[in-house]
């Protein structure tokens, strides 16, 4: 009886953890940015700080959650194609020459991420779709919006 109860609790915890990790994410932008859509290749360049300026001349800043956060697991796999430690090194290297306007900012919460994107001209970020508010604009990836079939950052 005790073994069955422990097994049920264990299965519940595993299922709950996998559902929590399968979040739908979205790319959001500062409203002053002229970018409404981005290709997957261009998104990778922005995330890796390989794109310094938008077509209108504004400096690009990418805002993200900590590479160790569960939210970033999918982004590490689908966008960066690198490990957490490699991404941490990339953040340090990318920001070294851009102290006044960092290439990559790390936020401690989705709320902080949205606020940083909203208040930083040229900023874009990746955030849980349920944290989006009217202070930021949603950017299409590969012609698709979040929750549309085939969207790159769909959680499942």
PLM-predicted stretches and their roles:
Residues 1, 22-23:
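Absolute protein N-terminus
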Residues 1-10:
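Bacterial N-terminal signal peptides that target proteins for export
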Residues 12-13, 50:
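Short, charged beta->alpha transition segments
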Residues 14-15, 119:
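Residue-level detector of alpha-helix boundary/anchor positions
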Residues 15-22:
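Sec/Tat signal peptide C-region and signal peptidase I cleavage site
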Residues 23-156:
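Exported/periplasmic ABC-transporter solute-binding proteins
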